Amino acid sequence: MIEGLREDLRNRRIGSGMSRLDEHWVRCGRLDPHDEDAAGLLCYVSQWVDAGWRDIDVIQDGLCAFPKGRRVGLSILDYAYVLMAEGVVWVAEENIARALANFDLVLSLKTEIVEREILALAHFWSSRCNRKAGEYDRALEHVSEACRLASEADAGPMAATMRVAESWLLFQKSRTKDALKMLSEADAVLRETDDFLTRGNIESSYGRMYRREGRYDLGLRHFSAAIDEYGKRDPEHRNLARTLTNMGYVERLIALQLRKRIDSDVSQHRRSEPELRRDYENMRAQALAHLDRASEIYRLHANHRGAGTVCVNRGHLHLDSGDLYKADDEAREAYALGEQKNDYILMARARLLECMVENTKLEEEIDDAAWVAHLALEAAKEAVDLARRTENRRLLARALIWLGLTTCTTSPGSLDAAREISEQAAALLKNEVQDHIWEDLQVLKARVVKGGNVDATLQAWSQGVVGDRTFQQLTEDFADLIIPKIWEHESRKVARVSKRLSISPKKVRRVLARLGLHGA
């Protein structure tokens, strides 16, 4: 039995492994604690539960046969088996610290464990824990080692499933070309299997990568393909809920693009096409429907990260439509869910949404201005603090951007601080595509430049007061000051600015784009 499960897992023969388990359950009804292979079977069954067979309560029930006192008498390999199974349960319960402790203990026994697959799985699960905690460097180290061990064990399909996770971590580090290549290679291997969950993960990864590049229609197509793959195994799998959440996120971004077109028509006294407004409303409705369905699935699995992410995305949709109090409620619920699991990423996202809500209240002069300003600034500061506890660069950049925007709004005399915050965010987004987060950065830069005291800046430079800025940074600062002014004087003609300053039009456009002015 155990050897068959191991081989099916190594080769990702999912239907075969599940049939094998179903037959065993018909005969026995549960794991036999007196079986000499009970610990090993429990370990491998935990991997099959992760692959889509039954629920985690099967493993929780099996662990009752291995209380702490009994584990002392186990062999080292059986002890490792039990630790692995228990770690999988901790992950399912979102207790990342305890799960990592289990997997670390297994890896500390590596000289005594001959099964390379077990060591590969321990590294793989450690990577999943690190990734969930936003510890991407450590996650990448673990998953790379997992892939190496699986390959050495001649478990190519198993290694391919691990490559999917590795590709996403590479993408997080802006190594998009490497990530896509690795994902394509894994896809080629797993297309020959019935591992529908991992095939769905591949499609979902493509969708998220294309979403990041602003190719929203292509992203939605891959998300739809992912849902089809997941549905072949389990129409209520938590990964399907994650993809529905991603779809809702992208549909909101598309709706925002449509609204910008509508607002542009209004500002230019043009009448928008009825189809445009209908498309906008339909896209918002689709986003909310997908988020509601995701919420139902996450509720079945009691998944805090997923449920909280739905709250954040739904809150942004409420914010977009001007329903500030619903948006605020969603932000607070998301924060509470994250706080229960010490989920810094979710907590930071929740505080970011709260900050945006309070900033909107300030703009619309809702509630006491001083108190709202205080709430906005505190939410922004906490979002930055929480994001710094992770290695999520985009999350930190976004938190910094909104701290900068809030500082500009609530403390007009603190533009130097806002400028420094803007530079920190820009450094984090240096190799990123020009998406909605980048657009927020341009708004911040424009506010800093517009609100700054140019005479005071030039006077400070003339006295040699430049802080810790390099000559290159000072050159860029000067370009940011002078080029927009001349652009205005020259009727916003890039060619005239280029000719007057004897610089390339490309340089002019780059500076204006950096400040969010080009094309305005």
What are these language model-derived features?
Residues N11, E93, S126, A133, ...:
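Structural motif corresponding to the intra-repeat A-B loop/turn of tetratricopeptide repeats
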Residues I14-G15, I56, I96, Y136, ...:
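TPR-repeat structural position
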Residues W25-G29, L63-R71, D104-T111, S144-A155, ...:
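Amphipathic alpha-helical segments of tetratricopeptide repeats
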Residues P33-E36, L77, E117, P157, ...:
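Residue signature of alpha-solenoid helical repeat architecture, marking inter-repeat boundaries
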Residues D37-L41, Y81, L121, T161, ...:
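Residue register of alpha-helical TPR repeats
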Residues Q463-A520:
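Bacterial C-terminal helix-turn-helix
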